[in-house]
Amino acid sequence: MFSFDIAPIWDKIAHIQSSCEAALKLSEPGVAPLDPARDVEVLHPKMHPPKKGFSSAEGQARMLHDLANIELQAMELGLRTLVEFPSAPVGFREELLAVTVNESEHLAMCLEGIEALGFKWGQWPVHNGLWRATDVEDNILDRILIVHRYLEGSGLDAGDTLIRRLEGTEGKFTIQKIVKQINYEEIGHVDFGSRWYREICESKQIDWASDFPARMDSLRTRLPKRLEPINRDLRRKAGFTEAEIIYQEELRLDFLKPTLDAQKKA
């Protein structure tokens, strides 16, 4: 049994290291569940209750709850890749183990922050949107692009915006410390994806500069729509080229277009 088969959140965290180590020993691809086990209600984001502002403890706890859900899925997606791609380069898999364990540490930080504010994990529903963006038919380059370059890359943009929104909020220091530490360490996670995407492309004699936009075009219909402005500085630190940043900016505008068109008609 792997960590994504376990429902209780703290048990998931306790088993992630051993799950990753077991996955490293696989010689054949393992099977991941359609959805990971959960001890909380899972609903589509449109069905979630409205959120309170960051000026309240509840609003801050809800934000950490949402962030915990993202870190939880990031942790499980790392394990999923280890389970489903046993033939990936050894260096990639060993480094991914460390990244995945680090995601579990981020999750624990969020859960402890929620409790410090007087709330509990499961007090609000969660979604499985990040997990559902991946598919059993993915190849290793698809998976790296989806998880480490798109989802986690978008998280850098959102995290920076979140840090600025927390400025001036009562009790901000503890919350900001958590968000800042996570966002700083996520730069390394995204850079991990950037480096290995290019290295694996080169090992397969694929031109990564042309593969990036082509592969993104083929995957974009199942990606969650990220609308935060692209943080160019953080993206560069995480290994994105200028052409890749421009692509992300244009993709964001495409995602925003229906909203902008509706506003023009109003």
Please tell me what each predicted stretch does.
Residues 1-266:
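Non-heme di-metal
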